Amino acid sequence: MPSLRYALVAYIESPVGEFVESLRRELHPSLPHLAAHLTLLPPRPLQGSEAAALQAIERICGQTEPFEVVLGDMKSFIPTTPTVYIPVAQGESRLRELHAQLNTQVLAFAEEWPYVPHVTIVQMATQPAAEQALAIARARWEQYSGSRRILLDRLTFVREDAPNCWVDLAPVSLGGSLVSP
């Protein structure tokens, strides 16, 4: 049995999050649809227990004040992967710092790719499909008139219980401690 994977995300519960979820459904209706989010720690096995991981997350996040990020222009990871995403244009360094602080001890993992703060829109099966999705996504993003700012004040520790089936384990406030769901 493969080991469980865990991640730390910031759900985007705002109009820009609704935009992302709608765009995902438009570009790839057959994919399982995850809530719009920024990933602080990409999926990984733990180097200890869930309880130890939560303690580490709470300690580090408790010392980090909430902050804002601003999303940039639509991009893709082509040719590395056929993925369309929105990078973080402002606040990227804060996310990188927090990622580095969290990617230690029980949460330590040698990630496959360098950490790039972003919101994934969709991962397609092929590069041509991703190029087509990117063109549509750019057009929709240019038409989007809402705020591209996201306040990061709460993160969520999640576990993958089945392929593409993530379960929320615990919300954690920045500048605070575990919060009740």
Describe each region flagged by the PLM.
Residues 1-181:
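Histidine-dependent nucleotide/RNA phosphoesterase domain, centered on the 2H-phosphoesterase fold
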